[in-house]
């Protein structure tokens, strides 16, 4: 029975990670006559005459282990950190947006498949009776922002029938009328064009000229516009030289926010393999407030490194060391970022804007 449960669990992990399973390969791993290939759900493989322990099913199993950089790069900016304990153990990766002077709206992941919305007070306490479970499923990483009609739009990545190779960006209205503030379920609409190749994840929304725009890629900086009919069109693509020390793809994190000077603050993360786990490190950047939205500044050190994750894993203990920012609010000199710590707990941190800017250098 235990062996069958392990097999089912491994199949589920493989489906979620790669969208398909090599049954023969899986059988070779779980074959009782090949116990040496299975030890605490890991496998050993040789790379340049070195043995590297990998998690079963992870795409990083074919990649070399990369050493972590020096402490001058892995910096943690001082901030006020808050843990948000939701009713569902293991809740993580929340998006946030300001509702009014007294309240914020938070949408988080109670598990790996669903979203729940709630209200927070200014001390980040959940307001009693405000929880609402949305009917959306097979969804990840909620980012929220108000549109010009005072509707709250939820933007997220979605998969159909666990086909992760076809992951795409969707949106839906979750509050029809800001004055009422009532959560609703409305039909979802596809945002990322169907003709785009590869998985589409972590598109970062922002508002420009009362229209929702989205950053599909950080470098090159690729910008789409979502029109009133929910049709998404690519507008701009600009290349720039990144000062970020980790030479991996810069991936989107939080929504972008317009600053007082008219430019936008945004964030990104990179993922690197280290000792069989994926380490997620976070940086920020500033881009122009005018088309084509050129990148003006970018971090050359982290504001929230992977090692700052401190929660005991509820899931993925053998897979990740991760702080994953999703939501951002900027109020005067205060930057409020919501994130998931090790895919285990919702957290919110307050930074001084000037401290984040100090992590960046000019882009020419």
Q: Where do the language-model regions lie?
A:
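Hydrophobic core register within WD40 beta-propeller blades
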Residues: 96, 142-144, 256, 328
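A short, acidic, amphipathic alpha-helical segment used as a generic capping/interface helix at domain edges
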Residues: 314-329, 333
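Beta-rich carbohydrate-recognition and catalytic domains
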Residues: 29, 40-89, 93, 97-137, ...
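Extended ligand-binding clefts on enzyme/binding-domain cores
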Residues: 252
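Membrane-proximal basic amphipathic "stem/tether" segments
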Residues: 1-63
